[in-house]
Regions:
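Short amphipathic alpha-helical interaction segments
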Residues: 35-46
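Short amphipathic alpha-helical interface segments
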Residues: 6-32
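Short, cationic-aromatic polyanion-contact patches
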Residues: 2-10, 23, 57-68
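Short loop/turn and capping residues at structural boundaries
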Residues: 28, 41, 58-59
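Short amphipathic alpha-helical segments enriched in leucine
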Residues: 18, 45-48
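A short, conserved structural fragment
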Residues: 48-58
């Protein structure tokens, strides 16, 4: 996967988070944006490395939230 594609996918996730924070379930983001696991993971890693997102979880589900 090219770095440009990872950055593009990170941008799609970021736009979704800016638009709608009502459901930030990682699996739902994956489905809505039609990404495979590799695409989602690398894009989330990109955003985390830039300190733009944080991860929270309950017992079964991971969520992504923008860093304030």
């Amino acid at each position: 996967m090219k770095k440009e594609q990872i950055g593009f996918n990170a941008g799609k996730i970021w736009q979704k988070l800016e638009k709608d924070l009502t459901d930030t379930n990682v699996n739902k983001i994956k489905r809505e944006l039609k990404m495979n696991s590799m695409e989602l993971g690398t894009a989330l890693g990109w955003l985390a490395r830039e300190n733009k997102i944080t991860f929270v979880s309950d017992e079964k589900t991971f969520y992504v939230l923008p860093v304030e």
